[in-house]
Amino acid sequence: MANTYSALKRVRQTERRTEVNRKNKTRLRHQIRAMRRAITAKDVKVAGELLPVTFSVIDRSAKSGIIKKNTAARYKSKLHLRVKALAA
């Protein structure tokens, strides 16, 4: 248990940040999962509509440090390639 006021404050801040990060990571995973489901179902229209939304969620996650920049680029690249192949 934290003994000083500043240590208690850091514990509170950490708990708050952990909760925010958990929600953002969950949102990211759900969005990518929905995108992959649309691709698997070969639904070009839905995949096309979800692509910009998914990219936005990925970019925000990378910006806030939920995932690394290169991981975000890799996710976006793979999803874009699959949607492009689906549309062709």
UniProtKB/Swiss-Prot annotation:
Query: What keywords sit in the KW lines?
Result: Ribonucleoprotein, Ribosomal protein, RNA-binding, rRNA-binding
An example Gene Ontology cellular component term from the record?
cytosol
Per the UniProt entry, what are the Gene Ontology biological process annotations, in alphabetical order? translation
Q: Does the keyword Chloroplast apply?
A: no
Role this protein plays: Binds directly to 16S ribosomal RNA.
**Belongs to which family?**
Belongs to the bacterial ribosomal protein bS20 family.
Q: Which NCBIfam families does the UniProt entry name for this protein?
A: S20
Protein name in the entry: Small ribosomal subunit protein bS20
